[in-house]
């Protein structure tokens, strides 16, 4: 297939083999952009002829690192597919991708995939609705917007086609790792929300329709009072969107990601505003 894949890594020995082997049947070349991993990530990558490793210092966020990859990877294929190391295409979607790509018209410059979420080994089916993300695009036709986190793909022209291709986000690390990661995320999220509270953010028209809708929802969330908004958001996800049907793992996911994490973000915002008085 006329596809190159790009994966960003740092100490991903627990995930990288699964991700690479998932892509071997659909990608001519797999570029791994590694931030000087200290585990076995690089050694695992070297086992595969289709994989080309480029090491580059972490610039501070995913968007900058991926855009650097777009500028520096010797991509010769028509299409680029992006996956994180802890992600993979669902088995039934591998064949679908081959068929969809073969039938695309010239005006289609990007494809959105459906996110399948796993938490502590269980698929989370409720609470957020269908999440679509642009994960494949014609070479030279897209870049990530410059954001600290929650970055979305900007497609410069043409059509973004919604597909039924599914990709899984299935991280194998333990809950302690997840909590530590989100404590770090909270600092960046607080900076983004503080910025949104002081100005109206109009979603970029180069974003997909789904990304624009998500950005509008975040703009609304940013205007709800601190601490109340995380509580309301959890209730919305867990009760109204039936997150309670996802069992114990589902409760932990919706509570930790929907309420706890966002409360930590609000605490950081509150502390910052308090110091400004």
List each language-model region with its residue ranges.
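Conserved donor nucleotide-binding strand/loop of the catalytic core
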Residues: 42-72, 76
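Acidic helix N-cap motif at the loop->helix transition within catalytic regions
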Residues: 17, 39-47, 92
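Short, structured coil segments at secondary-structure junctions
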Residues: 26, 47-49, 132, 156
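A conserved acidic beta->alpha catalytic loop
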Residues: 22, 34-43, 58, 84
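Cell-envelope/extracellular polymer assembly enzymes that use nucleotide-activated donors
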Residues: 2-4
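Catalytic-site signature of metal-activated, phosphate-bearing donor transferases
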Residues: 63-70, 83, 90-273
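Short aromatic/hydrophobic "clamp" motif used to bind/position activated sugar donors
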Residues: 78-80
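Short, well-formed alpha-helical segments that are part of the catalytic scaffolds
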Residues: 6-26
């Amino acid at each position: 297939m006329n596809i190159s894949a790009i994966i960003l890594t740092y100490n991903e020995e627990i995930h990288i083999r699964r991700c690479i082997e998932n892509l071997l049947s659909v990608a001519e070349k797999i570029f791994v952009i590694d931030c000087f991993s200290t585990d076995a990530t690089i050694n695992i990558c070297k086992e595969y002829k289709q994989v080309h490793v480029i090491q580059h210092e972490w610039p501070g966020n995913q968007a900058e690192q991926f855009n650097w990859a777009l500028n520096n990877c010797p991509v010769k294929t028509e299409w680029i597919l992006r996956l994180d190391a802890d992600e993979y295409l669902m088995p039934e979607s591998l064949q679908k991708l081959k068929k969809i790509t073969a039938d695309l018209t010239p005006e289609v410059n990007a494809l959105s995939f459906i996110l399948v979420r796993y938490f502590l080994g269980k698929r989370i089916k409720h609470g957020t609705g269908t999440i679509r993300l642009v994960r494949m695009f014609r070479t030279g036709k897209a870049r990530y917007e410059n954001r600290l986190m929650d970055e979305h793909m900007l497609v410069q022209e043409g059509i973004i086609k919604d597909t039924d291709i599914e990709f899984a986000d299935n991280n194998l690390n333990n809950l302690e790792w997840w909590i530590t990661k989100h404590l770090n995320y909270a600092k960046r999220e607080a900076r983004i929300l503080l910025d949104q509270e002081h100005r109206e953010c109009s979603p970029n028209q180069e974003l997909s329709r789904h990304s624009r809708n998500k950005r509008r929802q975040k703009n609304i969330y940013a205007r709800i009072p601190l601490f109340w908004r995380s509580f309301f958001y959890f209730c919305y996800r867990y009760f109204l969107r039936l997150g309670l049907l996802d069992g114990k793992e589902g409760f932990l996911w919706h509570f930790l990601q929907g309420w706890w994490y966002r409360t930590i973000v609000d605490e950081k915002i509150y502390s910052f505003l308090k110091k400004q008085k």
